[in-house]
């Protein structure tokens, strides 16, 4: 038997957890995610957005929303850009671990759409220019994973 997630968003309920920090990037990621969800037939009324101060706060809010039973998928969006200190490494590691842990604890797909870049230029490239829009890519993954899990439960 093969299990496969279809890219049809009809009847899915999705929440996006997005960081306000580096909002000139995360705003573009959010636009890309919402546009992609709608293009794949997710009803706009079935897309909720939760804003958090920074990337570090994403896992806690993602867990609360995933545990609510109200959503088929959670998309996490943020942008951490390397600076002159080791803060970047700590934040990136903990956020990645936190999002992964939410997947394990809730059985709701929590998609990692958090940019971890070496420069502002790299972030801009991944927010809708040269390297596509990682928010849009996260939305496609959310639809596929939500439908895949539904097919396994059936």
From Swiss-Prot:
Forms an icosahedral capsid composed of 60 subunits, arranged as a dodecamer of pentamers. Gene3D superfamilies: Lumazine/riboflavin synthase. The keyword Heme does not apply. It catalyses: (2S)-2-hydroxy-3-oxobutyl phosphate + 5-amino-6-(D-ribitylamino)uracil = 6,7-dimethyl-8-(1-D-ribityl)lumazine + phosphate + 2 H2O + H(+). It is an enzyme of class 2 (transferase). The keyword Lipoprotein does not apply. Its EC number is 2.5.1.78. Keywords: Riboflavin biosynthesis, Transferase. (2S)-2-hydroxy-3-oxobutyl phosphate binds at residues 84-85, 126. Pathway: Cofactor biosynthesis; riboflavin biosynthesis; riboflavin from 2-hydroxy-3-oxobutyl phosphate and 5-amino-6-(D-ribitylamino)uracil: step 1/2. Belongs to the DMRL synthase family. InterPro entries: LS, LS/RS, LS/RS_sf. 5-amino-6-(D-ribitylamino)uracil binds at residues 21, 55-57, 79-81, 112. It comes from Staphylococcus aureus (strain MRSA252). The gene is ribH. One of its GO terms (biological process) is riboflavin biosynthetic process. Disulfide bonds: none annotated. It holds the Pfam family DMRL_synthase. Catalyzes the formation of 6,7-dimethyl-8-ribityllumazine by condensation of 5-amino-6-(D-ribitylamino)uracil with 3,4-dihydroxy-2-butanone 4-phosphate. This is the penultimate step in the biosynthesis of riboflavin. Coiled coil: none annotated. The active site is at 87 (proton donor). This is 6,7-dimethyl-8-ribityllumazine synthase. GO terms for cellular component: cytosol; riboflavin synthase complex. GO terms for molecular function: 6,7-dimethyl-8-ribityllumazine synthase activity. CDD domains: Lumazine_synthase-I.
